[in-house]
Amino acid sequence: MLSKRIIPCLDCDLQVPEGRVVKGVEFKQIRYAGNPVELATKYYEQGADEIVFLDITASHERRSTMADVIEKTVENVFTPICVGGGIREVKDYVAMLKAGADKCSTNTAAIKDPSLINRASEHVGSQACVIGIDAKRRYVENPSESDEHYIVETNDGYCWFDCSIYGGREFTGIDAVKWAIECEERGAGEILLTSMDRDGTKIGYDLELTKTISENVSIPVIASGGVGNPEHIYDSFSKGKADAALAASIFHFDEYPIPQVKNYLKDKNIPIRI
């Protein structure tokens, strides 16, 4: 069995020199957490299996700023790096990989133009193409109400999962399960799956969402949104069937250091690199 991965996520505000890491609740209520290069170095030294940088400012004008951050990071950080936010064209993939990233994640641009996935995977390889899916529950009274959505029975009732774009500011009506399947068919190598309902809440991942996506694609799924303690990460693997768990605030604010989380998982017989 492949080892599960622990992935710190750095949401980067690049409107200031060198950038700063922030964290919100349900994509709002922003707190500042530190310098991206310094935090990435800290997490690498603690044993992070991968590090995700998300540019929340996501503008072409600041592409060079993110590239600078990545170039400085990889001078001392030797673990896989994924960059997301503002990845709109194949040339953006190329620029970030040239700066030192190993993967690029895109959400809005792929939904607006799904062929981007085909073109990017052909140009840089599927292993470098991560699709971010930011999903929110939409409840229905009757599972037969909609033929166009993948309906899931949860503890709170029947629902489907709606894909959002533009950092959660706009909903598309696109079913997240069907979209994940299409992304894999087009050449995506991984899904970065965030629950908008759980983001920053620390009440645990949306396990129904994670499990449903994981069972419908064969590529790795990264669970994101809602982790508050090591047990939540354990649940993402044991119940949610995720391949990796992404977390932010529990690491940024030193609530649960990465070594503590990994030792907890090891004691629970989860295959993990120590």
Curated annotation (Swiss-Prot):
GO biological process: L-histidine biosynthetic process
Enzyme class: lyase
Pathway: Amino-acid biosynthesis; L-histidine biosynthesis; L-histidine from 5-phospho-alpha-D-ribose 1-diphosphate: step 5/9
Keywords, ordered alphabetically: Amino-acid biosynthesis, Cytoplasm, Histidine biosynthesis, Lyase
Entry GO CC: cytoplasm
Family matches, as Gene3D superfamilies: Aldolase class I
Record's catalysed reaction(s): 5-[(5-phospho-1-deoxy-D-ribulos-1-ylimino)methylamino]-1-(5-phospho-beta-D-ribosyl)imidazole-4-carboxamide + L-glutamine = D-erythro-1-(imidazol-4-yl)glycerol 3-phosphate + 5-amino-1-(5-phospho-beta-D-ribosyl)imidazole-4-carboxamide + L-glutamate + H(+)
EC number per UniProt: 4.3.2.10
Active-site residues from the entry: 11, 134
One Pfam entry name: His_biosynth
Molecular function GO labels: imidazoleglycerol-phosphate synthase activity; lyase activity
Quaternary assembly: Heterodimer of HisH and HisF.
Role of this protein: IGPS catalyzes the conversion of PRFAR and glutamine to IGP, AICAR and glutamate. The HisF subunit catalyzes the cyclization activity that produces IGP and AICAR from PRFAR using the ammonia provided by the HisH subunit.
Protein name according to UniProt: Imidazole glycerol phosphate synthase subunit HisF
Source species of the chain: Methanosphaera stadtmanae (strain ATCC 43021 / DSM 3091 / JCM 11832 / MCB-3)
Gene name per UniProt: hisF
